[in-house]
Each structure stands twice: as structure tokens, then as C-alpha cells.
Amino acid sequence: MATIYVDGKEYEVDGADNLLQACLSLGLDVPYFCWHPALGSVGACRQCAVKQYQNADDKRGRLVMSCMTPSTDGTYISIEDEEAKEFRKCVVEWQMTNHPHDCPVCEEGGACHLQDMTVMTGHNSRRYRFTKRTHQNQDLGPFINHEMNRCIACYRCVRYYKDYAGGEDLGVYGAHDNVYFGRVEDGTLESEFSGNLVEVCPTGVFTDKTHSERYNRKWDMQFAPSICQQCSVGCNISPGERYGELRRIENRFHGSVNHYFLCDRGRFGYGYVNLPDRPRQPQLKNGNEQLAITVDGALNRAADALRNAKGVIGIGSPRASLESNFALRELVGANNFYVGVEQAEWQCQQQMLHILQHGGVPTPSLRDMEEADAILVLGEDVTMSAARIALSLRQAVKGKARELARKMKVDLWQVAAVQTLGQNQRYPLLITSLDTTRLDDVVEDKLHAPYADQARLGFAIANLLDPAAPAVTDLGAEQQAQAARWAELLGNAKKPLIIAGSSARSMALIEAASNIARALKGRGLEASIALVGQEANSLGLAMLASTSQPLEAALERIEAEEGLALVTVENDLYRRAARNRVDAALARLQHLLVIDHQATSTAQKADLVLPAASFAETDGTLVNMEGRAQRFFQVYAPAFYNADIQVREGWRWLAALQGTLEHKPLRWQTFDEISHACAASVPLLATMLEAAPNAGLRIRGMRLAREPHRYSGRTSMLANQNVSEPRVAQDPDSPFNFSMEGYAGSRQDMPQVPFAWAPGWNSPSAWNKFQDEVGGHLRAGDPGRRLLEATADTLDWFSAIPAPFKTADALQVVNYAQLFGGEELSARSPVIQARMSEPMLVLNPHDAARFALVEGGLVAFSWGGNHWRLPLRLSKKLSQGLVGLPLGVSGLPTALHQAYLANLQEAIA
């Protein structure tokens, strides 16, 4: 710690910070542009000038840039010095000489860091009357608008895109005061994290194109704290709504998970919430048509159907909340509840839960991952399955430069010096995969092989680290040497990290990862293991229904029994199983009841569809891959805008159905009631209630506001329908109001922050006001509750070492996961569809020659009653005997995993 004096007041600060960080952490306002908490200092903008004095007696002082000045003990500075204030005002004026002053038509207006800093410095009149520099804008793809004339040359964009995110197709061109930030030519930005430019840029150069199509100011949107639904990482988000539509998603700071950044799938994949074909009223099947019926009529028909069936079973979902899955299990009974994922994935998820519970090795948060000094990724393409992890791994490998900087006593915020000192030295990142990955540019070594051979390498590494681990006796000399190199790199680390997951559907890979983590822990290292699930609530479903059976068991029961009724919640069975098998099973049912918020293939076969609420229209709890229970809150009430909309939370439909069926009062009327019931009945979920406050929370006696206090048009937005002002929607399930009435701001500590705003800070930089220190954690504590923590337990060594992969006449299907299109919900979003690459079938050239197939030609194949025609791509990296398919895309079910195809043939276009 260090003692500094600011405008005559004494403060204790972290001596490792620069003065700008220190002042912002103290809650003092110092304007800045080029600095960012995640990017460090380069001193490019000169905006953060303060007056520094030699001692308490110095009255003259000198101007220094606070972002480039360390917080040494005994530092005396002044923010309010007149010379410093005038200098900062002049800097803004210089920045604005070429700015178009187009705030009224700029999409950044009202959430603009440049506006905030201009007001903060007091610059309020223009003196420049000459020709302004102009630029030609670029088309950067479906996600981001480009307006270069607003640029102030702060260099944040290229520092984030190239230095932080590892992108290569955005740069800066030109010299002196005529520089251009963009691509060499028009084209879609290639980075999976390009959307963060929208928040990194302090002006309106890079803006959200998906928001442009239905634009409104930040102060006119309704927000709620929420959780990304598009993978198992559980990033915190702030969705914004207007007129009953989700308009955009902003990052919600979480000190342990996503920090300041999201992946593009999470930021832009929300379009499925607004689709016009969503079921919004109960739908009754009448021949080939679906007829809208009333809520009471739907519940009575559903209850009659279940009452008259010979048995009722339920199929849950890893994309549904804990509460909805729990309500379904309570309706049908634990023995009749099935988890709704295929057997291979369910076995992997159960094993992953077992390892996290009893393995004795901690599971890292994303922030913890960034501190790892050696990383092994076994068979999991994290860029495609959990992209935000890939961004953290990029920061982790740069830790070598930070280590060198510490040895040389260079402050870590001096990023240019740290980069120069590092000279591209990195901590080792080791990856086993089927083919190339997006992390190959920072990898130390890699293995391209079938999953069985990848697992064998993992088991061999564990044995080399600890001879007590099972040995691989028939490993080839080349792989034995590679295992030795990798074991040495991991064994020499202090904080090694092992990553695996269920996307490969390989138990052997997960068990090999566990063995390696145990061996590293046994050597006294701070080892950690991250096991990546496939969907937002995969781990939560495993914790809730650890003894339940997979989808295949449900289909087998339907095939074996007559007269069953099936209730599914937020699950499209056709995505997870062969079409002919699902068709046959559904045809045998006496009644099919589907509760979902999307018009899926399963819903089209339903006798009755009950319209579920999407994540923006409901409350719920998810458990992310590290075992952190996190609550997402309802953003808006659809029925407020249109009384004909009858969507309900999945658990509310099920509670009402059970009450109708049993002729009893509802078991749960509020979210708090069902959450308490879930926590009480499942020991693993006993502490899930600590993930968020209950509906009774008040701050200074007030509920919390979902809308900024400047929200406009509330009394007139529906005047075209009725001149009488409707009462705002009421929320019995959370402490939030559907209005601007209530508490909003940063003065009182609260972990559930709907939107970032503080007096004078309207941009995402306002998160500084909510943190214990800039870039640290929220003052009230990061949201969520870890349900799984490492114990002193130690699992036995896993010994089921697979045999080497051998080619056969038929080709084994492996998944070529896709970030855009591979996840069910975001793949329905039009903007994500515009970003999806063409689905292809991938073969090794030798296999292509064996089937007489040529690259670029169409390949036809059949499986499970479906027929596909996909263009062929050849890859020498993919091992012989394998065929790569983008499962989940183009109707390719995930059950194709590790199936065998022998009928590949050339298709005539």
C-alpha cells in the first residue's frame, strides 16, 4: 500500500497502481480516453493530466499524465489545479477539431465516454472553424457499424483487438493526425470477440449494427441483470428492451467470470427472442393446423390428457432453468423424469460432476484461468464450445511477459514496456484436437489425432507425472516423446490448468484430464481443472437430476409402453436423436405436450404447445461450468405491450398444470417459493438461494429500477392503442420494478446491477463506480454462489485407457463445432445466420480418394432417416478413418457423434 495526497486529502492506495487507477478506485473523477482497465496504459491521449508536487511545500508542481505515473508513497497531486483543468479542457478541444459533432444522430449518444469526458472537462464551445478531416467508412460485417469520422485516435480498438484478443485483421494506418482504424479492405471482422469494440471504443466509431435496425437511446431502454444463455461459461449480461423487443445486449461486469468482455455469439445472438414465429399463445393441434386457445382451456385440456394417459413421463433440458426442470420433475415424478440429452453426453456430464465434487482439484473461474502458467487442453475446441475461455487463455499465455516484468521491477500497467520485455515469450499452451484451432497462433505444441489417441497421450502424461497413475504400455515412440515433453512443461509450472469437456463425447478424455490434474496436485502444485459443458445449464441439470436417465431411455420406454403422455420443456428432440426414431416414438404417444419459447420440430408434432418465456421474459437460475449458480432476471413483461401474448415461465405452466391436474392450490406462486423448494429437495443445490437476493430486497426502502431515471415515453408509448395510461407490470418474483421508480445508481452496494450508470458516467466506463477497485470485483461482491468447491477428497486413478484408434471401412463421425450456428438458440437469430459459414463435410485426402470424392464437390449421405448433401473440404490434419461434420447445424443431430458412415457418395448438383 502507498499513501498519496490528492488535493490536500490523504488516501491509502495500492502502490502497484498508476495514479489514474488509484484515483478512479477512490471514486475521484479524472477524465481519460486511451486507458482501459483491461488494456493498461500507453499515454496516447494526454487527457488524464494532473498536477504533481515534489512535497507538501511545493506550490508550483508540474503536469504529469496520471495513467503513466506510479502511485508511490508520499505522492502529492492535484486534480482540481487550474492549470491541470485548463490543460484537460484543451486536450478535449483538440480531440474535437476533426470530430463531426453529430451527437444527435450518433448511436453512441447518451452512452458515450467522449460525451462524458467533454462535459467533465468543461469544454462547451467550439472555436475551430476550418475544414475537418474526413474518412470513408468500411463494411465490417453484420455485427458492427463503422464511422471513422468520429475517431479521436485513442488506439483502444487496435490495442484490444490485436494485443488483447489476438485479432489480425484490424489495424491502424496513416501518420500524425491523419490515421485510420479499420481493415485493409472491407470485410467481416474475423475475431470471435469483435463485438467488444462497441464498448471499448470511447466514441461512436464502432457501434452495434444489430441495435441500429431498432435503435433507441440507452436511457429509453429497460434492463435487468441476466446471464448469457449461449454456452456453459455463464457470462453476465445486461439485455436492453424497448416496445416489447430485445434491442441489444451489453456486458455486465463480473470480477470472476467475464470481466469487461463477451464473445460475439453471446453479444449478438439474442435475435431468437424477437422471432415472429415464436409461440405466444397456447396452441392446440387440429389436423395439420395449430389453433390458438385460452390459458384455462389449455390447462384443462392438458390436465385431461395427462389424467387419461396410462403413464406420464417428462423430458427436461440443459437450456432450461433449474426451476423449470425441477417443476417438471415434481409433476411427473423422479422416476419418470429424463434429462433430454443423448446418453454419451449425459455420461460425460455425470462424470464431470463426479470429478468436480470429489476430485480434490479446484475448478478455476475465468480470472483464475488467466493466472495459469501452463495449460493443457484435451480434445475441447474451447473457441467454439466456450469462446470466452479462449480469450482468457490468450491472457494466460502472456503471463510470461508479466513474470519477466516483475523480475525487472516494471509496473504491469506499463503495457508497452511489458510487451517489449516479453518479446513474444509465452507460457506453454498445449492442445490436442482433431484439426487446427483458432488458438494455434499462441500454442506451444499440439497433437492432431482421434479422440482415443488424444486420451492415450493424456493418460501417459499423468503416468509420467506420477508413476502411480496407470501407464499406457503400447504408446508409440513419437507420442511417448511428446508425452515426456508435455509432462515436463506441466510439472515445471506453478499453476497448471487442465481443460477438457463433453463436446467430444469421450469419457476417456475427461478421465485422462482428471488423472493429470490429480498427478499435478500430488506434486504440490496449484493445479486446477476446468470441465466444459455443452449448454447453459448442463451442470445444473446434472446436479438436479444426477440419477435420472438420458434421452435414449425415454425413447426406449415410449417404444415399449402404450398410451404414454410426454411433457417436454425447452427441448427439441430432433436436435438430439435420429429423426426416424423420434418420429416413431412420438407417433406412439397418446399425448405430446411441449412447453417451449421456440417453434421447434418437436413443437410442430405436439398435440398442445404451451408458450414458455424466453430468458428475457422470465427469472431463473443456471449453474455454469465452474459450479456457480447465477440468477437471471426478467427484463420485460410481454403482456404489458400486448394482452394477447400469453407466455409464461416454464415452471409457472407446470405448477398451474399440476394444480389443475390434482384439483389443488398452486404449490408455488412466486419464484422465491419454487427456488426454496428446489434447494430444499436437492442437497447439491442447498445454497443456490444465495445466488441472488429474494423479492423482498429493498434499498433505502425502495425496490430497484429496471429503467434509467431519464426513461421517456412510458405514458405515451401505447397511446395509439388506448389513451388511458396502463398500470406498469407488477413483479412478485424479484426486487425490481418495471419502471424508473426505485433505486438506481452506484452509491449503495448491490451485486445485481441492471445497467451501468453513475452521475457523470453514462458509458460502460461507469462500472468503475461499482467496483472495490478499478478492474477488481464489485463492491457488493460478484453475483452468484459457487456450489462446488474442492475438498480434501482424492479420486482413484481412472484406468480405462482406450485402445489406439483403428480405421475401418466406415468412417467415424466427429464434431467440427461451430461458434456461429452450433448452438441451438443463437442459430435461429438472423444476424448469426448471416455470420455462419457454409456447412461442410471434412475428410482426410486419403479417405476422399477411397470414396472417389473431390474437394468442393457435393457429398451425399444418410443417417437416421435424414439425407444430407454437403460440400467437401479436405484436411490433412484430420486423421484417416474420421469424417468431420458440424453437428447441430443443417439439421445434423448431436446423436451422430461417433456414429459410422459407410455410404458417402458424390452428389450431382
From Swiss-Prot:
Keyword Translocase part of the UniProt annotation: yes
UniProt GO cellular component terms: membrane
E.C. numbers: 7.1.1.-
Binding site for [4Fe-4S] cluster 1: 99, 103, 106, 112
Cofactor annotation: [2Fe-2S] cluster; [4Fe-4S] cluster
Binding site for [2Fe-2S] cluster: 34, 45, 48, 67
GO function terms (MF aspect): 2 iron, 2 sulfur cluster binding; 4 iron, 4 sulfur cluster binding; metal ion binding; NADH dehydrogenase (ubiquinone) activity; quinone binding
Cofactor, free-text remark: Binds 1 [2Fe-2S] cluster per subunit. Binds 3 [4Fe-4S] clusters per subunit.
Keyword list, A-Z: 2Fe-2S, 4Fe-4S, Iron, Iron-sulfur, Metal-binding, NAD, Quinone, Translocase, Ubiquinone
GO biological process: ATP synthesis coupled electron transport; respiratory electron transport chain
Domain 4Fe-4S His(Cys)3-ligated-type, first and last residues per copy: 83-122
Domain 2Fe-2S ferredoxin-type stretches: 1-83
CDD domains reported in the protein's UniProt record: fer2, MopB_CT_NDH-1_NuoG2-N7, MopB_NDH-1_NuoG2-N7
Residue ranges constituting the 4Fe-4S Mo/W bis-MGD-type domain according to the UniProt record: 221-277
Residues holding [4Fe-4S] cluster 2: 151, 154, 157, 201
UniProt family annotation: Belongs to the complex I 75 kDa subunit family.
The protein's assembly and partners: Composed of 13 different subunits. Subunits NuoCD, E, F, and G constitute the peripheral sector of the complex.
Job description of the protein: NDH-1 shuttles electrons from NADH, via FMN and iron-sulfur (Fe-S) centers, to quinones in the respiratory chain. The immediate electron acceptor for the enzyme in this species is believed to be ubiquinone. Couples the redox reaction to proton translocation (for every two electrons transferred, four hydrogen ions are translocated across the cytoplasmic membrane), and thus conserves the redox energy in a proton gradient.
Protein name: NADH-quinone oxidoreductase subunit G
